[in-house]
């Protein structure tokens, strides 16, 4: 094999090209808030922000663990080391249990999660005795045999157990509601009557510094949440190592994300219209994709002025300066430059922003968007004016009779379409509507009558959350009961009528059943849709309360439905989607974490050139099992892959700017080792280019 590979490369010159294989996932967990540190001798395991990593004491290396590699879940609640069998017990918020060995093998116990019961199955803490792990749960105690990965016993006590332990010959259950209860180990632990009171409940406090008996030291996290080694000198602890932790976001909460200039920008959201909740401060995070590095934006400007930054909901990037962004929030408008806040605007600053009616303590900027000239447009809840902060720094107001000071108008999800119209939705069930503002004519058009082309009322007192334009210039709208779109002709009709347009009939797409009945079903009917994004192939990505749906360009085929059950999604409630059109990477934001999926659609090019067209991975090594991707193609490019003998092994049309080959010939058989020629021509067949793929079996 090695000799063949050497001969192959001596004949043909192949740059080693690798990209993320189509269908692969990445997760981006936070490690900022350590809750458990577990020394095991060679390794120190750390549970931080519901994610797991380990530090190798001998070589100083870090390893992360996730549901994208070895683990069977995410949102970890507890960890504990069972030294007798050298396994780490991991419990999750969905009540599943993993047993992780030092070699990376994982055994899963799903019996508790699978148990059909109305009891509270939440696992509050773990106590280890010998080869057994005792789980304190919402209904009692579960005894796990870590040696053979089974549940040995389950003691339903009928009340929440905060923690448990063994002392002497008794098992103790500490409960906030029942106090401290105990039962002799030789008694019938299944019998609730055998459990007797042993005193009052005392809260269990975790030690900040965890002693490592093997390495004769203490472990804790420093002020930057980094794992640090300490030695105790008298009553004080002295750091004797530099702190370490994996890179990641500060928080796992991602309510809104946007792709811009090779980075993902994220805000936490948590917008509560009812109360002015300050428990979730605003926070901007940036992921630099090429360097795989996370940055946290500096909010000290507002903090120094005693101004709370609350519930940031939308990010707008200045088209003239990518390092200048504006963020809409429940507490006003925030301006950042070079990852630092430099200004904020609200009802108390010199601008036309108003406070929410009857709530004078805060002002809501519900949505923002820059136009191509660098002017920032925004809606201010409780204000019947559209506001604009020009590129010169001048504030302007445009009164609109379709707006109201009523707090039922929460206009958001702003974007400019291909015509230059500023679209928005109102996510209040009191007044569901969508529409646009024409900045050239200072005219607003809205649709609040939602009767579809069949004459059926499709929205009545329902929330609308998402709006976007597809590549056929249809405007798609997502609500808590599904999706619909209006056509370019509908938009023209809206432009021809002043004010509210009741003649527009949104289209609910019908998907044929193809079962001989001539019946059809509405696309994603009764699905709660939070966001919609369109990729280069005009496919629709829907973020919903039940995962992510990918729908074909003709809207008739569900190409994928990702959930926590079949993907590394950290939560089924997906709030936002961002697409890197250059690479085809699709990012999914949830309040429990961020992840990405490598799709098969990339940027399309105007011409076929040697610089743009290439295949990856190249060479295709024996251990590779995915699809090979040819990228850098024009829209609708015709692709033929041939062996050196001239035999055709694959042909087809590009999807977006890429073409997928499964490495098989026309009969579905894996091709042999060799060099394969990729002939590419435009959709019109007017020009072509050849690249090569090396396959090594």
Locations of regions flagged by a protein language model:
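Positively charged n-region of N-terminal signal peptides that target proteins for export
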Residues: 1-4, 697
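Glycine-centered tight-turn motifs at strand-turn-strand junctions
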Residues: 648-671, 682-686
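Carboxylate-rich, polar loop motifs that coordinate divalent cations or form catalytic acidic clusters
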Residues: 3, 18-613, 648
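Short, conserved beta-strand segments of beta-strand-rich sandwich/propeller modules, principally
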Residues: 585, 672-677
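Sec-dependent N-terminal signal peptides
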Residues: 4-13
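Short, glycine-anchored, charge-dense loop/turn motifs used at functional sites
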Residues: 638-649, 668, 676
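Glycine-centered coil/turn sites that cap beta-strands in beta-rich domains
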Residues: 607-640, 658-661
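C-terminal tail/sorting-segment detector
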Residues: 677-697
């Amino acid at each position: 094999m090695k000799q063949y590979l050497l001969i192959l490369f001596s004949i043909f010159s192949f740059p080693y090209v690798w990209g993320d294989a189509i269908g692969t996932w990445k997760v981006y967990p936070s490690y900022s808030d350590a809750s458990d540190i577990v020394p095991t001798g060679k390794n120190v395991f750390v549970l931080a922000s519901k994610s797991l990593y380990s530090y190798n004491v001998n070589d100083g290396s870090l390893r992360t663990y996730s549901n994208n590699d070895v683990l069977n879940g995410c949102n970890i609640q507890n960890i504990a080391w069972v030294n007798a069998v050298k396994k780490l017990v991991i419990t999750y918020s969905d009540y599943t249990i993993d047993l992780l060995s030092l070699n990376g093998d994982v055994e899963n116990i799903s019996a508790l999660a699978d148990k059909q019961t109305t009891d509270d199955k939440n696992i509050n803490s773990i106590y280890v005795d010998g080869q057994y792990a005792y789980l304190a749960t919402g209904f009692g105690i579960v005894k796990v045999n870590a040696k053979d990965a089974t549940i040995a016993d389950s003691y339903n006590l009928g009340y929440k157990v905060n923690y448990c332990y063994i002392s002497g010959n008794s098992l103790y259950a500490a409960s906030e509601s029942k106090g401290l209860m105990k039962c002799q180990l030789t008694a019938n632990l299944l019998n609730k009557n055998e459990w007797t009171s042993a005193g009052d409940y005392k809260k269990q406090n975790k030690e900040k510094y965890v002693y490592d008996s093997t390495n004769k030291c203490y472990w804790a996290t420093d002020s930057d949440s980094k794992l640090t080694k300490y030695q105790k000198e008298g009553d004080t602890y002295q750091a004797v190592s530099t702190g370490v932790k994996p890179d990641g976001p500060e928080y796992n909460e991602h309510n809104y994300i946007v792709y811009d200039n090779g980075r993902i920008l994220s805000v936490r959201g948590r917008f509560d219209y009812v109360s002015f909740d300050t428990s979730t401060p605003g926070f901007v995070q940036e992921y630099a994709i090429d360097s795989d590095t996370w940055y946290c934006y500096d909010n000290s400007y507002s903090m120094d002025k005693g101004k709370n930054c609350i519930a940031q909901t939308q990010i707008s990037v200045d088209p003239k300066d990518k390092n200048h962004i504006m963020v809409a929030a429940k507490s006003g408008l925030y301006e950042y430059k070079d990852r630092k806040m430099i200004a904020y605007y609200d009802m108390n600053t010199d601008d036309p922003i108003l406070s929410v009616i009857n709530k004078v303590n805060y002002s809501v900027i519900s949505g923002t968007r820059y136009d191509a000239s660098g002017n920032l447009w925004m809606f201010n809840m409780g204000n019947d004016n559209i506001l604009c902060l020009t590129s010169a720094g001048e504030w302007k107001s445009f009164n609109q009779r379709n707006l109201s000071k009523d707090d039922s108008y929460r206009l958001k999800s702003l974007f400019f379409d291909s015509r230059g119209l500023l679209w928005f939705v109102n996510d209040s069930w009191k007044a569901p509507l969508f529409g646009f503002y024409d900045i050239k004519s200072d005219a607003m058009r809205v649709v609040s009558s939602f009767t579809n082309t069949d004459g059926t009322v499709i929205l009545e007192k329902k929330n609308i959350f998402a709006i976007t334009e597809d590549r056929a210039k249809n405007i798609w709208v997502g609500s808590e009961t599904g999706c619909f779109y209006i056509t370019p002709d509908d938009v023209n009709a809206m432009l021809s009528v002043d004010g509210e347009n009741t003649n527009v009939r949104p289209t609910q797409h019908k998907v044929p059943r193809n079962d001989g009945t001539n019946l059809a079903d509405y696309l994603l009917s009764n699905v709660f849709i939070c966001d919609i994004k369109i990729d280069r192939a005009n496919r629709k990505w829907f973020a919903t309360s039940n995962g992510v749906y990918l729908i074909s360009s003709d809207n008739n085929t569900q190409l994928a439905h990702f959930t926590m059950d079949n993907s590394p999604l950290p939560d089924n409630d997906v709030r936002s989607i961002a697409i890197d059109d250059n690479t085809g990477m699709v990012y999914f934001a949830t309040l429990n974490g961020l992840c990405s999926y490598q799709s098969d659609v990339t940027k399309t090019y105007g011409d076929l050139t040697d610089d743009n067209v290439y295949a990856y991975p190249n060479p295709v090594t024996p251990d590779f099992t995915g699809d090979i991707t040819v990228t850098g193609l024009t829209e609708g490019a015709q692709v033929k892959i041939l062996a050196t003998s001239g035999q055709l092994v694959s042909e087809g049309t590009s999807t977006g700017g890429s073409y997928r080959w499964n490495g098989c010939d026309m009969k579905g058989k894996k091709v042999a080792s060799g060099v394969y020629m990729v002939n590419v021509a435009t959709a019109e067949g007017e020009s072509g280019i050849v690249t090569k793929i090396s396959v090594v079996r």
